[in-house]
Amino acid sequence: MASGMGVDENCVARFNELKIRKTVKWIVFKIENTKIVVEKDGKGNADEFRGALPANDCRFAVYNCGNKIQFVLWCPDNAPVKPRMTYASSKDALLKKLDGATAVALEAHEMGDLAPLA
């Protein structure tokens, strides 16, 4: 199911900085109205990255693992149903714009699902 969600230009620009310049290690994206935008980014480790994800809401993220850039669909089990559906149906729109991120998203529902990023 396609959502028709737009992707803000800054998402691609920040991703390229992560991929090429390595100025940040991770980026968290959120849906704002009908567009995917950058919410925050950081240079810290996996623990800092996990701390940047909301406990009760969905997000997209990318994390530079060194040998690959992992795309993450963060949908905690306690997030409302509508955002979970919106994020799930919108991930391909963002993935298509982020050239170099893993094609298969790591779908995480709890912090333990993010253990492979350590």
UniProtKB/Swiss-Prot annotation:
Summary of subunit composition and partner proteins: Interacts with ACT1 (G-actin); the interaction results in inhibition of actin polymerization. Interacts with DPA; the interaction enhances ADF activity in disassembly of filamentous actin and inhibition of actin polymerization.
Classification via SMART domains: ADF
Task of the protein: Inhibits actin polymerization. Promotes actin depolymerization. Strongly sequesters actin monomers (G-actin). Weakly severs actin filaments (F-actin).
Stretches assigned to the ADF-H domain: 4-118
Keywords: Actin-binding, Cytoplasm
GO cellular component: actin cytoskeleton; cytoplasm
GO BP terms, alphabetized: actin filament depolymerization; negative regulation of actin filament polymerization
InterPro entries for the chain: ADF-H (IPR002108), ADF-H/Gelsolin-like_dom_sf (IPR029006), ADF/Cofilin (IPR017904)
GO MF terms held by the record: actin filament severing activity; actin monomer binding; protein sequestering activity
Subcellular localization, as worded in the UniProt entry: Cytoplasm
Stated family: Belongs to the actin-binding proteins ADF family.
Naturally occurring in which organism (per UniProt): Toxoplasma gondii
Superkingdom as given in the UniProt entry: Eukaryota
Pfam families found in the cross-reference section: Cofilin_ADF
pH dependence: pH-independent.
Name under which the protein is recorded: Actin depolymerizing factor ADF
